[in-house]
Each structure stands twice: as C-alpha cells, then as structure tokens.
Swiss-Prot record:
Record-stated family: Belongs to the amidase family. GatA subfamily.
EC number: 6.3.5.7
A Pfam family this chain is assigned to: Amidase
Lineage: Bacteria, Pseudomonadati, Chlorobiota, Chlorobiia, Chlorobiales
Known catalytic reactions: L-glutamyl-tRNA(Gln) + L-glutamine + ATP + H2O = L-glutaminyl-tRNA(Gln) + L-glutamate + ADP + phosphate + H(+)
Function as written in the Swiss-Prot or TrEMBL entry: Allows the formation of correctly charged Gln-tRNA(Gln) through the transamidation of misacylated Glu-tRNA(Gln) in organisms which lack glutaminyl-tRNA synthetase. The reaction takes place in the presence of glutamine and ATP through an activated gamma-phospho-Glu-tRNA(Gln).
Keyword Cytoplasm belongs to the record: no
Assembly mode: Heterotrimer of A, B and C subunits.
Protein name: Glutamyl-tRNA(Gln) amidotransferase subunit A
GO molecular function: ATP binding; glutaminyl-tRNA synthase (glutamine-hydrolyzing) activity
Record-linked HAMAP family: GatA
EC supergroup of this enzyme: ligase
Keywords recorded for this protein, A-Z: ATP-binding, Ligase, Nucleotide-binding, Protein biosynthesis
Origin species: Chlorobium limicola (strain DSM 245 / NBRC 103803 / 6330)
Keyword Nucleotide-binding applies: yes
C-alpha cells in the first residue's frame, strides 16, 4: 500500500483496515527492489518490523496511537539513532555506531513513527548532488542519469520514490530544500533553533538545522511540530512555544497576501523554463487576489561567497575531532602519532571535504582572518538586516529553489564553483536563519521537477507552510 499523505494512511491504520506490519513490509520490499540506487546506506529490516508489530499490538489492546502512528520514515545518516551506524557517508566513520538518540529521533519515536533506515548523503553534508558519498551516487527518481540534489539526496529520493512517507534531512545552506526541488517534493528548513541539533553531526554549527522532506505540506508540518521545541541538550534551541501549525496554515488566505519577488532572483543565468514555471505559479496567486511586490536584495550576489567562507571555517574546526585516535577510521600507516593523524584524515575524508577543511583553515589563519572571515560575518549581518526590512513590507519572499533543473550525474563534479551555484537561492535563508521551504510547482519540457522557494520571518513556519500549501502542485 502506498498512500500520498499520512492522514490517508493513518485513517487506514486506525480503522484497522490495514496493519502497521503490512505497511512496513510493503515499504521494505520496495526498498529492496531499489537497493542498487544507493538510496539507503542502512536498512532496519528487523527493527522496523518489530516496531510495527508492537504498534499493532498497542492498537488492538486499546492503546492511544501517537501522532505519527505507523508513519514509515527515513533518517539521514548524519543523525544519531542509538545502536545504528552513523557514517555521514564517509569512510572515516564507516564502522562507527551511535551511542545515543538524537532529540529529534526521540520525539518522533515517542509518537510512534517507524524508522526504515538511514539514507545516503553527500559526505558530512558537503555537496549539492549526493555524488560526494563513500557509498556512491544516488540517481534522481525522475531520471536516473541525473542527480537528486544534495546533501540530503538520499532522503529526498526515498520520499520521491515511495521508499518512505517522510524523511529527515539536515540543511546548512539548502541541503533539504534543493533536493526537494529536484525530486518534486516538499522540503522544509525551520528557523535556526526551532529543532534541537543534539545528535546531528556538525558541519557548520551556526547554520545547521534538521529539516523535513515529505510529499505534502501537511505531513511536513506535522513532523515539524513534533520535533520542535526547547531541548536542554542544545543551548541554541529556542524557548519559544511551539504553535499549532495546522491552525496557522488553515488561517492563511491568498487574498491580500503580499508576495515579495526579488529582481535579483530572475536574472539572465536563470534557466528559462524554471523562470517561466515559477512566474506562472506566482501569477496564479495574483489572479486569486495576492499582490506581487517587486523588491530588491542587492547583496544577493555576495551570498555564496560569504556562505562558503563562514561554513568552511566552522567545518575546519568541527571536523578536527576526526583524527583516527578516538573513533572511526584509523590508517594502517601509523608509524607515529603524527602519521596516524595525517594518514587517517587523508585516507578517510573525500575530496570535497578536504577542499572545505583547507579553505576553512586558510580563512581562519592569522594573516587572512580579518580579510575573509571577519568580513563575511559583517556581510551576514547585512543580510539579516536586509531580509528583516523586506519582510516588514511583504508576507513572504518567493523565487526559484534552484537556478536550473536536476543536472546530469558527473556534470559539475570537476567544477566546484558551478556546483556551489546550485544553492544560490537557498543560501540566504540559511545565512539569516529564517524558515524556508521548497514546494513543487511544475515540470519542465523534459519532465524534470521545478521547485519554488519561499522565505518567511523568524518562527513563522505555520504561515510559511500555509502559503506553500496554496502553491503546491496537486
């Protein structure tokens, strides 16, 4: 059985027209049929079936079903599940097992979600195509010669291919939203601090945020509401109360909605069909009573440069812990301590991770700190001011999720700067920490998905998802 929304599935489960065990077995069978696509790194066959049987027993005995009762979910392999592997798609963590659950995982499990396995990703969440993985590339479910996006490409492909009803990813600069756009699904990055990062392997700590990938806005918001909230294990998690997202979404009306459309998002380098599809969808909302407001965000050209200075600096610090001494991969060429450190990291990390560590170390060095890192922090503050000012005048900022549709596997691997541009529209929301979502709005002439990207003010996830629901391609 494969249903398009969790509410449909829940209705079938609660009425006992179908069992959790049957649902889970169906998903596991499909996962097995797609095993050559590298979508999952680890599949929890026994654990998922055992959990499903417990849920069936709970229901038969009159127990109260949780809010996610029987929802089959996938978890990106940089999020901790106790006793399961935690590879981050890297050789350096190939044999490591988590010793605790991430807070997000604990909260989902407490509401009766069923975890099917851990999904493939770009190594340490560094990439936009899911090609930077020690476990191989993941194909796009719509065209297996093309990428699913990254770094949460495995999670996006799992949902799009019907191998999970929803999935968790992590989003540092677009790693949930960009693959969602490439895979014709919804990808939500909440406000920084809305979801605890406890149990998420750090890439860039002031940017990282756990996000949700789902087939529709209702499912994504439901999962968000369960994970959101203060966590004593994460000092950066917000104390703000978690609202009723369903009620907030229902309150959103198209008539009178002010949609900010930055002129910088629709430049000559934007793929023609992507621009046409996004504009057409915006015009549909205008015809229903929304107001399209032209806005300008002149600093947009500096987003990618500032972002890659800041995140590589944080990555060079965060990844220093992987040295072969405490856990993970240790080189056999370890004649002394220094050789162990150098060879373990050289052999354990992939090309893109090493590139970013070196770049981060460079921008933090004494001679270049003020020139690069300090200046990028100043640019970040300017971005925060500009986006706050813009969102005082409009309800939401809208544009394409990516400047181009899914590209061919291998097409951009030798040109990192071109690869980085895949995130040019998603990076600003990460720089400022505001909530953002990619919602599917159409298909181009080659039947490749096109997503629209929306940004709202801090902690306005309900409003954001309500607007997205009006845009979502049926």
């Amino acid at each position: 059985m494969q249903l398009s929304s969790y509410q449909d599935l829940r209705s079938e489960l609660i009425s006992r027209r179908i069992t959790c065990e049957k649902v889970v077995l169906d998903y596991l069978e499909r996962i097995d049929r797609h095993r050559d696509d590298n979508i999952y790194i680890t599949v929890f066959h026994e654990q998922a079936v055992e959990k499903a049987r417990k849920l069936d027993k709970k229901l038969s005995e009159g127990g109260l079903p949780g809010k996610l009762f029987g929802m089959p979910m996938a978890i990106k392999d940089n999020i901790s599940i106790k006793g399961a592997g935690l590879t981050c798609a890297s050789r350096i963590l190939e044999n490591y097992e988590s010793v605790y659950d991430a807070t997000a995982v604990q909260r989902l499990e407490a509401e009766d979600a069923v975890f099917l396995g851990k999904t493939n990703m770009d190594e340490f969440a560094m990439g936009s195509s899911n090609e930077n993985s020690a476990f191989g590339a993941v194909p796009n479910p719509f065209d297996k010669t093309r990428v699913p996006g990254g770094s949460s490409g495995g999670s996006a492909a799992a949902v799009a291919a019907g191998l999970a009803l929803a999935a968790l990813g992590s989003d540092t600069g677009g790693s949930v939203r960009q693959p969602a756009g490439f895979c014709d699904i919804v990808g939500l990055k909440p406000t920084y601090g809305r979801i605890s990062r406890y149990g998420l392997v750090a890439f860039a700590s002031s940017f990282d945020q756990i996000g949700v990938l789902a087939r529709n806005c209702d499912d994504a918001s439901l999962v968000l509401g369960i994970m959101a909230g203060k966590d004593e294990h994460d000092a950066t998690s917000s104390h703000r109360d978690v609202p009723d997202y369903a009620a907030d979404m229902a309150a959103v009306r198209v008539e009178g909605l002010k949609i900010g459309v930055p002129k910088e998002y629709f430049h000559e380098s934007l793929n023609r069909e992507v621009g046409e599809i996004v504009r057409a969808k915006l015009h549909e909302l205008r015809d229903k009573g929304a107001e399209l407001v032209d806005i300008t965000l002149p600093e947009s050209d500096y987003a990618i440069a500032a972002y890659y200075i800041l995140v590589t600096a944080e990555a060079s610090s965060n990844l220093a812990r992987f040295d072969g001494a405490r856990y993970g991969y240790r080189s056999s060429r370890a004649e002394d301590v220094l050789a162990m450190y150098v060879n373990s990291r050289t052999e354990g990390f992939g090309k893109e991770v090493k590139r970013r560590i070196m770049l981060g170390t460079y921008v933090l060095s004494a001679g270049y700190y003020d020139t690069y890192y300090k200046k990028a922090q100043q640019v970040r503050r300017v971005f925060q001011d500009r986006y706050r000012e813009a969102l005082e005048k409009v309800d939401v900022i809208a544009g394409p999720t990516s400047p181009f549709p899914p590209f061919s596997i291998g097409e951009k691997m030798d040109d990192p700067l071109e690869m980085y541009l895949a995130d040019v529209f998603t990076v600003p929301a990460s720089i400022v920490g505001m909530p953002a979502v990619s919602v599917p709005v159409g298909m181009d002439s080659r039947n490749l998905p096109v997503g629209m990207h929306l940004i709202c003010d801090f902690f306005e996830e309900g409003k954001l998802m309500g607007i997205a629901r009006h845009l979502q391609r049926r």
